[in-house]
């Protein structure tokens, strides 16, 4: 019992230790994670005309979509979708570059004397026409268009009848005087203006004082050539390192917080560049159903209605007549294009074709189906009316550009046709539909509308006005598909809902690009693991060639973290391969068009997209390098994971979900990684200072020992050489000083016959002491030198003996250490042999036991039928 309790406690302790094991921050490179971005996208187009080739790169026709198993929020309007905002800015630049408005100089901001031009046709209306127009009713039989009897589809119109019902454009011939080539002399000029483009003081029609409209804020800079572009479609593409997400949900209506059918693409579909107010022309998105998009899902001030393509709605606009343009040279370098003198233009007009009433009826049915939190108007579709707005000409009319000319079309007749009633623009009933001149009145129903062409317009993107050259010569015509309309939903006290055409241009790009979302790929992720970085070595991961694209990389966004982490090497290759491939394609296109791109604004944007991609790639690599993780897909660190309450579910959680949970921790994690990297660099620096002693196995390098012995041998030779040099120097010094005999050890006797104490003649006193004094001095000096030489010799001998003994002792110790090492290696070898023998015996015993168990199981299986038979026999007997 006690043993069982101890085993249980031991197992519980082991489990606690395993569960509380320290985790460390691990850096993963190549995780499929992204964040919203507002980076500048670039454009592609299949069009090969001049504008397209100078502003966009050729289309690669790659429409690959990779589905993602994730949910993502989407928003269609420009204030929350940077791609939609970019479209508005870029299309405005298209207008500026191609239509070339004239600005900054005001030669025509002067007083002009104007005379109204007479009509080129009789002002009286023929009787046949009068008879057909005086009693116009709501029935379709009075319309100048043929209608299919079995449906409400408008098939064709009689252009002659339409043109007879339209008035001519009112125009005036204006004369003015200004300095020309000679500055001190004024010259008279004559220019024809449309009456809508001049401001005149009250007076008779024969002679009026007029000024150009918006004279104070719209001026002319240069002679502006008349240019235009045909229908142009382009695609927005994400720079390298970025991507476009697309929402494919069926119920998407411009706003959704959890779009589930998401795919990733490199470029959008082809979108149109037609700018209009009210109606959406030539849209790229159309389905077999009517859709209503509300801004931010709840706004009634900005509503997008997408028509059902089943109704085949189109509009054809024409400017009849063979208009001619007369160039007027105003001054040196400035030519103003005027209409030819004494001519009046016929009005332009637009004819609406298709089942418009059926489409409008379906729109009303969809409006009343809106949830109550999004629509509080009437549920009676008969009380829902389509109307126009009042105010600036661009807002009050259908405004669009047709072959470079700006059309302003008054929609009253067509709106009366759609609403199937005869009222004035204020919804007041009126009797009769006869208007001014030949034209029908505002209460008439028509499937066509009258249009004006103007040269002075309000800029739709900036708060300014632009002046363009007068309309071009010849016949103008363009046909467009109507895919939707921009409206406002207004309610009033009469239990009526007014659907008002809106001039908001951004609705066009919301319809075209609202399903797309520009994101920045952030391939660096953090997660806790139980592996700590080994700081003993620094080896660099080998880089491999890249062969796949980044769409496949993002395709793993919906997989679990564990499955994605096991393929990080391949995913990082996909990411970098996509970056490199996109850069290669973009660079090739830029190089092919470098001469044409160098002066265009969109060309600069394309180059900027390339620079942005390079900056992003270098930024990611710089971050990895700062953490010591350069060129690594999985990089373990020495930073402990301090947030134990935040751990990933590797089998069920995606990287995107995990990154969103720890996004607020990223700042702390990166700071700790940088500090750990700095400390590691300091440790590495100190470690390298001791690198010559760091490797234990370097002691067994024979070449190092030879170097040490060589140094010792050279030291001994140096000492011996110094000793020899000193000896030679001593000998030479003695020779140079001369020979000095040593003092005698035995007294030298004087000459014979002379006693010791004998005195010579004339000598007196004892001379013995004085005669021996020089000998004593000489003897003392020689003795000192002899002693010094002996001591030097002894010191050299002792030094040699000490050096010899030291070397001998060192060799003895080395021999002893080598013997110990040899003994240790022998013991290790013996232990290893014993361990191998023990493992072999253990394996043999285990194999034998396994064989016995298998044999027993085999015999049991084989003997089972016999034992069953024996048991049955015993039971039956």
Curated annotation (Swiss-Prot):
GO terms for molecular function: structural molecule activity. Residues 114-173 are annotated as: V1. Residues 668-692 form a coiled coil. Residues 409-451 are annotated as: V4. The keyword Disulfide bond applies. This is Envelope glycoprotein gp160. The surface protein gp120 (SU) attaches the virus to the host lymphoid cell by binding to the primary receptor CD4. This interaction induces a structural rearrangement creating a high affinity binding site for a chemokine coreceptor like CCR5. This peculiar 2 stage receptor-interaction strategy allows gp120 to maintain the highly conserved coreceptor-binding site in a cryptic conformation, protected from neutralizing antibodies. These changes are transmitted to the transmembrane protein gp41 and are thought to activate its fusogenic potential by unmasking its fusion peptide. Surface protein gp120 (SU) may target the virus to gut-associated lymphoid tissue (GALT) by binding host ITGA4/ITGB7 (alpha-4/beta-7 integrins), a complex that mediates T-cell migration to the GALT. Interaction between gp120 and ITGA4/ITGB7 would allow the virus to enter GALT early in the infection, infecting and killing most of GALT's resting CD4+ T-cells. This T-cell depletion is believed to be the major insult to the host immune system leading to AIDS. One of its GO terms (cellular component) is host cell endosome membrane. It holds the Pfam family GP41. The record marks 543-544 as: Cleavage.
């Amino acid at each position: 019992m006690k043993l069982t309790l101890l085993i249980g406690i031991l197992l519980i302790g082991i489990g606690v230790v395993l569960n509380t094991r320290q985790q460390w921050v691990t850096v993963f490179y190549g995780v499929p994670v992204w964040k919203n971005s507002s980076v500048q996208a670039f454009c592609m187009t299949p069009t090969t005309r001049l504008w397209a080739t100078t502003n966009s790169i050729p289309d690669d026709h790659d429409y690959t979509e990779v589905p993602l198993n994730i949910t993502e929020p989407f928003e269609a309007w420009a204030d929350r979708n940077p791609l939609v905002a970019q479209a508005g800015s870029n299309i405005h630049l298209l207008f500026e570059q191609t239509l070339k408005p004239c600005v900054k100089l005001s030669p025509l901001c002067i007083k002009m004397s104007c005379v109204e031009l007479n009509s080129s046709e009789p002002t009286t209306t023929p009787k046949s026409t009068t008879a057909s127009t005086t009693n116009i009713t709501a029935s379709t039989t009075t319309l100048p268009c043929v209608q299919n009897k079995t449906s409400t589809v408008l098939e064709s119109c009689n252009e002659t009848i339409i043109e007879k019902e339209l008035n001519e454009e009112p125009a005036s011939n204006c004369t003015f005087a200004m300095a020309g080539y000679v500055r001190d002399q004024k010259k008279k000029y004559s220019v024809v203006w449309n009456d809508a483009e001049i401001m005149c003081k009250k007076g008779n029609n024969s002679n009026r004082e007029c000024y150009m409209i918006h004279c104070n804020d719209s001026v002319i800079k240069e002679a502006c050539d008349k240019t235009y572009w045909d229908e142009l479609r382009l695609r927005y593409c994400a720079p390298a390192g970025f991507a476009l997400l697309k929402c494919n949900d069926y119920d998407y209506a411009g706003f959704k917080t959890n779009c589930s059918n998401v795919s990733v693409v490199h470029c959008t579909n082809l979108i149109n560049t037609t700018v209009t107010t009210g109606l959406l022309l030539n849209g790229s998105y159309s389905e077999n159903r009517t859709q209503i998009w509300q801004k931010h899902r709840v706004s009634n001030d900005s509503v997008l209605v997408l028509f059902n393509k089943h109704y085949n709605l189109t509009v054809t606009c024409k400017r009849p007549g063979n208009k001619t343009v007369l160039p007027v040279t105003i001054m040196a370098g400035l030519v103003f294009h005027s209409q030819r003198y004494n001519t009046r233009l016929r009005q332009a007009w637009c004819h609406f074709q298709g089942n418009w009433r059926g489409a409008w009826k379906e729109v009303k049915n969809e409006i009343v189906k809106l949830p109550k939190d999004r629509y509080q108007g009437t549920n009676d579709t008969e009380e829902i009316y389509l109307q126009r707005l009042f105010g600036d000409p661009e807002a009050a009319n259908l405004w669009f550009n047709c072959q470079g000319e700006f059309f302003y079309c008054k929609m009253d007749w067509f709106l009366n046709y759609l609403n199937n009633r005869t009222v004035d623009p204020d919804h007041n009933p009126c009797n009769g539909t006869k208007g001014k001149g030949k034209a029908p009145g505002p209460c008439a129903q028509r499937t066509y509308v009258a249009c004006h062409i103007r040269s002075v317009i309000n800029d739709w993107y900036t708060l300014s006005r632009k002046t363009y050259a007068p309309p071009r010569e010849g016949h103008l015509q363009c046909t467009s598909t109507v895919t939707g309309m921009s409206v406002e939903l207004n309610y009033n006290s009469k239990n009526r809902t007014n659907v008002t055409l809106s001039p908001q241009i951004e609705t066009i790009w919301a319809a075209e690009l609202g399903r797309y979302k520009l994101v920045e790929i952030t391939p660096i992720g953090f997660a806790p693991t139980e592996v700590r970085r080994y700081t003993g070595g620094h080896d660099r991961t080998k880089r491999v060639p890249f062969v796949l694209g980044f769409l496949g990389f993002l395709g793993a966004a919906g997989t679990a973290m564990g499955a994605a982490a096991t393929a990080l090497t391949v995913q990082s290759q996909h990411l970098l391969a996509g970056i490199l491939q996109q850069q290669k394609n973009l660079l090739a296109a830029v190089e092919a068009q470098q001469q044409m791109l160098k002066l265009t604004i969109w060309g600069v944007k394309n180059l900027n997209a390339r620079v942005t991609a390079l900056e992003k790639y270098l930024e990611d690599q710089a971050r990895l390098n700062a953490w010591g993780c350069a060129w690594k897909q999985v990089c373990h660190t020495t930073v402990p994971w301090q947030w134990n309450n935040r751990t990933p579910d590797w089998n069920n959680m995606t990287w995107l979900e995990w990154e969103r949970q720890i996004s607020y921790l990223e700042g702390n994690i990166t700071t700790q990684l940088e500090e750990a990297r700095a400390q590691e660099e300091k440790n590495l620096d100190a470690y390298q200072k001791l690198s010559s002693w760091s490797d234990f196995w370097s002691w067994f390098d024979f070449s190092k020992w030879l170097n040490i012995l060589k140094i010792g041998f050279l030291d001994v030779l140096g000492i011996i050489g110094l000793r020899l040099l000193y000896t030679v120097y001593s000998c030479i010094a003695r020779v140079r000083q001369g020979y000095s005999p040593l003092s005698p050890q035995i007294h030298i006797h004087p000459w014979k016959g002379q006693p010791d104490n004998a005195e010579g003649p004339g000598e007196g006193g004892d001379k013995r002491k004085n005669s021996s004094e020089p000998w004593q001095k000489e003897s003392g000096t020689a003795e000192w030198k002899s002693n010094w030489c002996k001591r030097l010799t002894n010191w050299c001998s002792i030094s040699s003996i000490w050096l010899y003994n030291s070397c001998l002792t060192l060799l003895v110790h080395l021999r002893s250490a080598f013997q110990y090492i040899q003994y240790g290696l022998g013991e290790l070898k013996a232990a290893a042999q014993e361990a191998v023998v023990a493992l072999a015996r253990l394996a043999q015993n285990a194999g034998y036991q396994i064989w016995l168990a298998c044999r027993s199981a085999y015999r049991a299986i084989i003997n089972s039928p016999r034992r069953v038979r024996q048991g049955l026999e015993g039971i039956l007997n």
